[in-house]
């Protein structure tokens, strides 16, 4: 039986199929790898790539366009260079380098691309923000006026830090720079400050130690650790601080307070120098590229105290669309960059650059560290340019003459080594100075509440400790603060709540100290 083909049926079937045919095609802008090695790839064909745009290489290796030249694009690789070879196809993503942000990041250890590396599973966040962003303009800022307590007596009394400030921690290796930063993070517990610790070029074991310390003191609850270790590619070390700043800006722009520690920026500068030389950019002083100052200035300028006026804050320059509905005023981002010097040379290229960008510096010295003064802060050349207006009144009152007293003590101490015949006044000044130096010493990971600092510094500057043997000052401090806490809690409470040291509060501290010193000295003789 022969079947007859009806032309109208055939044409209707063809019409149906043609109507359902989707002619859409995915269009990718692709290029070819010309050369690869040392974390750098030269790509031909990506004529529309933007500076800072993410590029997709084979084997899930991501890269970023950094050099836009006439005939090729110089890209840095965020993965292993040996996974990419000449002739490989590279895709443009159309996305500028960004990082996921949100509360889910707290308590986690991530790499600079926002990927978790702590084995605690994926991080669920809704928002991505660009790594590079212009700093808020002058109109959107407010002057620094709220204190950020570090818990370290030497810093909170003489080199105070305010929320929104950039304070440099500078010193040779092994002088306690990281310890100062970690103590500050631990001291933010219960103060509503979110912390970001950015480890750049450190050993993996050192980062693990920092994370363990933060966990031990319950600080990981409000902290994110971003790490690009010494074994990670240079491009990751280069972008790590920008990832920290972006995460901090999320908290700052949503009306909260954040603290970011960059440990350390000398290693970021070295990584950037490596990339720049491999990209054939012309070298300048110490072989650093000409824009190494801009590298650090554009990063540190992002730390700011934002205006309380929400309407003004919402008009902030370069505000990402993802944040516009969440903006609140009054937030702050405080930066503590760390710089490592060689043999105490603060006048080298990178240290002078960062000193000129920041609002002050805390200078740590090997000699002081080795002589047992810890934190090993050289008060003479350490300074906080804007923190004074953020210091609480009580501390300003008791520590007003502290810096001068210590400077005079150091001078007299140097002279007293030459001669043994000292008059009474000089001897008294030397004794007072030795006790002040002693009360500023502090153990690691034992930050002290500001009201306790005020009480003990008050005794030192008022000369009440002159009767206590200098070798027993630390013991006295511990026992006296314990006494205040249990027998006179209202004294500490008054300082903490009002931020001032009223005359009757000062008298109560004096009375308690005089009684306690008598019994303390008797105990010592017994």
UniProtKB/Swiss-Prot annotation:
GO terms for cellular component: plasma membrane; proton-transporting ATP synthase complex. CDD domains: ATP-synt_F1_alpha_C, ATP-synt_F1_alpha_N, F1-ATPase_alpha_CD. It is a peripheral membrane protein. Pfam families: ATP-synt_ab, ATP-synt_ab_C, ATP-synt_ab_N. ATP binds at residues 171-178. Belongs to the ATPase alpha/beta chains family. NCBIfam families: atpA, PRK13343.1. This is ATP synthase subunit alpha. The gene is atpA.
